[in-house]
Amino acid sequence: MGPAEAGFGDYVALLKPRVMSLVVFTAFVGLWIAPQPVNPFVAFCAVLFIALGGGASGALNMWYDADIDAVMRRTAGRPVPSGRVTSQEPLAVGIALSGLSVMMLGAGGNWFAAGFLAFTIFFYAVVYTIWLKRSTPQNIVIGGAAGAFPPMIGWALPTGGIGIESLLMFALIFFWTPPHFWALALFMKDDYSKAGVPMLTVTHGRKVTRCHIFAYTLVLAPFALWLGFTSVGGPLYLAVSVVLNALFIAGGWQILRRSEDQAQADGYRVEKRYFRLSLYYTFLHFLALLVQHWVGGW
C-alpha cells in the first residue's frame, strides 16, 4: 500500500490528536489563569499555534518511531507502520509545522513563549524520542518534561516570563507522567520488550515498577496541593485536588501490594483501573484551576 491510500484522517493521526488535546487544554488554562489579561482572539490564535507545535512533535515522533510502532500491538495501526503514509511524510509535516508554529507564536504573541515552544518541540522530538526512549528506563521520567511545558508556555504568553504558579503546573504534569505510563507498562510489558524499549518493567521488572509508581504518587501530591495555595488556587481547586490525590495514592498503594500472580489472575484489573484514573487526574486538576479562576480564588 502506498501513500495514495492515505485519507485526511491519517494525516490528522500523525499529529497524535489525543495527546495534543491535553497539550492544548493545559496550555489554554495556563494562559487564561495568568494574572495579565489577554485578548480572546490572541488567546485562540496562540493556543492554535501551540497545538500545531504539539502536532509537529507528534509527527516527528511518528517518523522516528515507525519501526517500533510496527512491532507493538498498541501502535501497529498507526498511519506509517500500516503503510497508509510513507515514512518520510511525517518528517516533512513535523518540520513544516515546527517552523510555522514557532514563527506565528512569536509574531502573534511573544518571542519568549515562542522560544519555549521551540525548545519543547526539540526536547520531545530529539531528547526524548531519538535519545532517551531507547536508551534508558528513565526515558519517561526525563522525557515527561516535554508534556509538562505547555502550561508554562501558555502562562508566558501574557506574562512574558515564569512564575511559581507555572512551575507548579509543570511539576504536576511532570511527576504525574511516570506513574501514568508505568501503569500502562505493567500490562503492556511484552509489547515494550518485543519492541526493545527499555521501560522500567522491562529492565527492572514489575515489582520494582510498582514501588516506583507508589513513590511518585507520594511525590506528586504535595505539588498538586501546593498549587491550591497560590494566586491561581482556592478552596474549590483544593477540594478537587485532595480527592484526586487521595484516590491516586490509594490506587498506587493497591498496585504496590499486588503480586504478579494476582495481577495475571484478574487480567491486571487494578492496574488498568489506575491507568484510567490517571487519564482523568491531570485533566480534572486543570479544569478545577479554570473553574476556580472563574469563581474567584482566595
Swiss-Prot record:
For membrane topology, the record states: Multi-pass membrane protein
Q: Which reaction does it catalyse?
A: heme b + (2E,6E)-farnesyl diphosphate + H2O = Fe(II)-heme o + diphosphate
Pathway in which the depicted protein is active: Porphyrin-containing compound metabolism; heme O biosynthesis; heme O from protoheme: step 1/1
Lineage, top-rank taxon, reads Bacteria
Stored Pfam families: UbiA
Q: Which UniProt keywords apply?
A: Cell inner membrane, Cell membrane, Heme biosynthesis, Membrane, Transferase, Transmembrane, Transmembrane helix
Q: Give EC number(s), comma-separated.
A: 2.5.1.141
Instruction: List localization entries.
Output: Cell inner membrane
Cellular component GO terms, alphabetically? plasma membrane
State one molecular function term (GO): protoheme IX farnesyltransferase activity
**Swiss-Prot/TrEMBL GO biological process terms:** heme O biosynthetic process
For this UniProt entry, which segments traverse the membrane?
A: 19-39, 40-60, 91-111, 112-132, 140-160, 167-187, 213-233, 236-256, 277-297
Function, as annotated = Converts heme B (protoheme IX) to heme O by substitution of the vinyl group on carbon 2 of heme B porphyrin ring with a hydroxyethyl farnesyl side group.
Protein family according to the UniProt entry: Belongs to the UbiA prenyltransferase family. Protoheme IX farnesyltransferase subfamily.
Self-association or partners: how does it assemble?
A: Interacts with CtaA.
Also noted in the record is: Carbon 2 of the heme B porphyrin ring is defined according to the Fischer nomenclature.
Q: Which HAMAP family match?
A: CyoE_CtaB (MF_00154)
Official protein name in the record: Protoheme IX farnesyltransferase
Species of origin: Paracoccus denitrificans
Lineage, uppermost ranks: Bacteria, Pseudomonadati, Pseudomonadota, Alphaproteobacteria, Rhodobacterales
